[in-house]
């Protein structure tokens, strides 16, 4: 009998969703501290063209020190430059309008929209688009009309407004989020996190990647299936050709 064990990290704090449900709206300093960590982690993924596509408080975990862990990359996809995604995924309350409408979309822009919903929820304790039923909620998301409570600070209201833009091209990008006054306001809480988390990824050398496989027999089929979860639209044969290529 062959036994296989899956070793996972234990994250004591549980889901961010449960934390907000229990304690309600968070103080701005705490909400932004968590949001900065979410953006830092997501920005790192985006540097490698990996989009999460299912960001929501249920998929964000907190450790014993209340630091963020992004989880559940089951919907994640690789989006090379110039490539558009088309799979409809994510939770309706957090999905971007372009996904709801069935348009081709940029995964990074859709992720940023979801982050705006999360920031709103952290600061208010409720969601900006919640029509009580699925159909009404989807219509609200498509329109992109919502009200920002007056008790939010000007910085918070401005950042949320810049993120929750229905048209992706009008949506603030990751680097400008990081440089926004709300983020800079609480920079002292995580001084080690700064611009190295944002921007293009450094090129990987052949030495860092390891030598290419020499034949199809060297390709592990389980790993190939895992690669296909990121390259949704690429056939297995094409992936194998790329793995065998010396480039």
Model-predicted segments: where are they?
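Structural helix C-cap motif within protein kinase domains
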Residues: 124-127
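Conserved short submotifs of the Hanks-type protein kinase catalytic core
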Residues: 2-15, 19
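Activation segment signature within eukaryotic-like protein kinase domains
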Residues: 34-35
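Protein kinase catalytic-loop region centered on the HRD/HxD motif
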Residues: 38-50
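Conserved catalytic-loop aspartate of Hanks-type protein kinases
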Residues: 111
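A conserved short helix/loop substructure at the end of the activation segment
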Residues: 164-176
């Amino acid at each position: 009998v062959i036994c296989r064990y899956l070793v996972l990290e234990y994250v004591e704090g549980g889901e961010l969703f449960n934390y907000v449900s229990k304690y309600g709206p968070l103080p701005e300093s705490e909400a932004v501290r968590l949001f900065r960590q979410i953006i830092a982690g997501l920005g790192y993924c985006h540097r490698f063209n990996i989009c999460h596509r299912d960001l929501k408080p249920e998929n964000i975990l907190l450790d014993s020190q209340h630091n963020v862990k992004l989880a559940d990359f089951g919907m994640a996809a690789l989006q090379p430059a110039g490539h558009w995604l088309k799979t409809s995924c994510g939770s309706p309350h957090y999905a971007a309008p372009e996904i709801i409408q069935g348009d081709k979309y940029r995964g990074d822009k859709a992720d940023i929209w979801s982050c705006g919903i999360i920031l709103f929820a952290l600061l208010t304790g409720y969601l900006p688009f919640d029509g009580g039923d699925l159909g009404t909620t989807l219509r609200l998301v498509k329109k992109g009309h919502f009200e920002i409570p007056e008790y939010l600070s000007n910085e918070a209201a401005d950042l949320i407004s810049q993120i929750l833009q229905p048209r992706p091209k009008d949506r603030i990008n990751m680097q400008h989020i990081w440089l926004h006054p709300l983020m800079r306001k609480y920079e002292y809480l995580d001084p080690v996190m700064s611009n190295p988390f944002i921007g293009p990824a450094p090129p990987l050398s052949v030495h860092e990647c390891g030598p290419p496989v020499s034949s199809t027999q060297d390709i592990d089929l389980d790993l190939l299936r895992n690669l296909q979860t990121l390259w949704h639209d690429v056939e297995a044969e094409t992936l194998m050709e790329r793995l065998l290529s010396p480039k």
